[in-house]
Amino acid sequence: MSSRPQNIGIKAIELYFPSQYVDQVELEKFDGVSAGKYTIGLGQTKMSFCDDREDIYSFALTATSKLLKNYNIDPNSIGFLEVGTETLLDKSKSVKSVLMQLFGDNTNIEGVDTINACYGGTNAVFNAINWVESSAWDGRDAIVVAGDIALYAKGNARPTGGAGAVALLIGPNAPIVAEPGLRGTYMQHAYDFYKPDLTSEYPYVDGHYSVNCYSKALDAAYRAYCKREAKQANGTNGVTNGDASTKTGLDRFDYMAFHSPTCKLVQKSYARLLYHDYLANADSPVFAEVAPELRDMDYEKSLTDKVVEKTFMTLTKKRFQERVNPAIQVATNCGNMYCGSVWSGLASLISVVDNKDLEGKRIGLFSYGSGLAASFLSFRINGSVDKISDVLNIPSRLESRRAVPPETYDQMCDLRKQAHLQKDYTPKGDPSTILPGTYYLTKVDDMFKREYAIKE
């Protein structure tokens, strides 16, 4: 019997985001809010968006086709393909089925779509890894596509939008290895963010409650992860940062990526994990300056307590800049990609940090989707990621985008609203703004069938 696959994980990454963005400083002025409300309060710099020329099908087609092309992947070498998204164009037909046109005669590909707010991409990654680990595996690789177009009605939530998609090649002998058995998951019923109105792209959101749900999910998923890790107890849980007097459990992760509704929430969430370390070992010299009453604080109160937040944000400030900030460069410049968010964070990290500083390092990753579903997992860099970094080329691609004024962004939001669920429709957006190699919508016929072209 042949040996089972080893070092299963991510072998290649492609990232797509639209060619245009709105500057959050300009959006603050346009919305008439105080300076810094979006840029400092939310931690957002720019926000990607698209008009009616692009949709989740075009995003997924672009990301997947570029993954195949840029890594010279034979379409016949793919045996599993799954899509995570909450941007629905059809209540029956999957985005995955649309992508099948990229695979020619290779029709033997498992997987469909997986949906739960921003968590679908992570569930698709789990399904892909599980497939490679299973008796169903036929020796081929898997692809996961995670992406969305995040839009909100006018108001406080609109600056937390964004757009983009990530395509991941998953298989054995990967340079970014998913650490076997190390996952912690938390699932609950909650109405924090949901989309019951299928005639609209806009969600119903209880913002403060959703942040509370996110924090609870982070706590529970991290605790579940730590319990799994402790059970393994095989000597692989060593700390790579700090000495005995400065290390904490958080230091076992050299880098971290989070689902990023806003970059400010990511910063608070990283600090929250150190609070867990404090509760587990409050007598450590690391926490000598922490007020002792924080140890016995009621859990519900701790979720919103400003002293807890400020104390641990201060303690993690330097580590955040070194270990987490590289993973939010896409989020602060593109906004929230929903299902693609945490995976664009991983892409950002790989693209921004030098390969020599990544080899052999551990990456913690937290994924959250409202409603709610959340997981904490980890990867280890097992070899060079130079090829992935070169293909992603994120900093220069972000720099080459086109800024549009908030007035234009507002008009394009209205245009998408008018185009939503239309049939016998020709998009009104300007195709000249779309970059070469990008799929875009050309027509929706009277049977709702959608037609696309590739920008030459």
Curated annotation (Swiss-Prot):
GO terms for molecular function: hydroxymethylglutaryl-CoA synthase activity. Keywords: Lipid biosynthesis, Lipid metabolism, Steroid biosynthesis, Steroid metabolism, Sterol biosynthesis, Sterol metabolism, Transferase. Pathway: Metabolic intermediate biosynthesis; (R)-mevalonate biosynthesis; (R)-mevalonate from acetyl-CoA: step 2/3. GO terms for biological process: acetyl-CoA metabolic process; ergosterol biosynthetic process; farnesyl diphosphate biosynthetic process, mevalonate pathway. Gene3D superfamilies: 3.40.47.10. The active site is at 86 (proton donor/acceptor), 118 (acyl-thioester intermediate), 259 (proton donor/acceptor). Transmembrane segments: none annotated. Induction: Expression is regulated by the Zn(2)-C6 fungal-type transcription factor FgSR which binds directly to the promoter. It comes from the Eukaryota. (3S)-3-hydroxy-3-methylglutaryl-CoA binds at residues 35, 118, 156, 160, 210, 259, 268, 336, 370. It catalyses: acetoacetyl-CoA + acetyl-CoA + H2O = (3S)-3-hydroxy-3-methylglutaryl-CoA + CoA + H(+). Its EC number is 2.3.3.10. InterPro entries: HMG_CoA_synt_AS, HMG_CoA_synt_C_dom, HMG_CoA_synth_N, HMG_CoA_synthase_euk, Thiolase-like. Hydroxymethylglutaryl-CoA synthase; part of the first module of ergosterol biosynthesis pathway that includes the early steps of the pathway, conserved across all eukaryotes, and which results in the formation of mevalonate from acetyl-coenzyme A (acetyl-CoA). ERG13 condenses acetyl-CoA with acetoacetyl-CoA to form hydroxymethylglutaryl-CoA (HMG-CoA). The first module starts with the action of the cytosolic acetyl-CoA acetyltransferase ERG10B that catalyzes the formation of acetoacetyl-CoA. Belongs to the thiolase-like superfamily. HMG-CoA synthase family. This is Hydroxymethylglutaryl-CoA synthase ERG13. The lineage of its organism: Eukaryota, Fungi, Dikarya, Ascomycota, Pezizomycotina.
